[in-house]
Design a protein with these regions (language model features):
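Structured C-terminal cap/extension of enzyme domains
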Residues: 2-109
Length: 109
């Protein structure tokens, strides 16, 4: 998202915004404040999360990321599978890198 925001985009519609809302807002605010070093740092961390959630079951991976941050867990409906154990581990690791586990707002502070 950083390159788009830096070029003047007024926002975005992406699953990553739902998967890591606090870090996504901080990224937006950093670009608007001209703090491109912080924005790029957040962008790189969000890319790690994006690579963990993007798959044929993106909705399930996004919901899993949300549940790790304190939102009530939900389930997938057939034929969509739940996030696999490998996907869950990658998502957890990416959220740890953002400081976003358990509803924490560390990434946004």
């Amino acid at each position: 998202m950083y390159p788009s925001y830096a070029l003047g985009a007024h926002g975005s519609i992406a699953a990553i915004l739902s998967a890591a809302p606090h870090a996504s807002v901080e990224l937006w605010n950093a670009v608007k404040a001209g703090n491109h070093a912080r924005a790029l740092e957040l962008h790189q961390k969000l890319l790690t999360l994006w690579n963990a959630i993007v798959s044929d079951n993106l909705p399930a991976c996004t919901r899993y990321a949300q549940s790790l941050q304190g939102l009530p867990p939900t389930f997938s409906r057939a034929p969509m599978p739940e996030a696999s154990p490998a996907q869950q581990a990658a998502i957890r690791k990416a959220l740890e890198g953002l400081g976003a586990l358990g509803g924490s707002r560390e990434a946004a502070e």
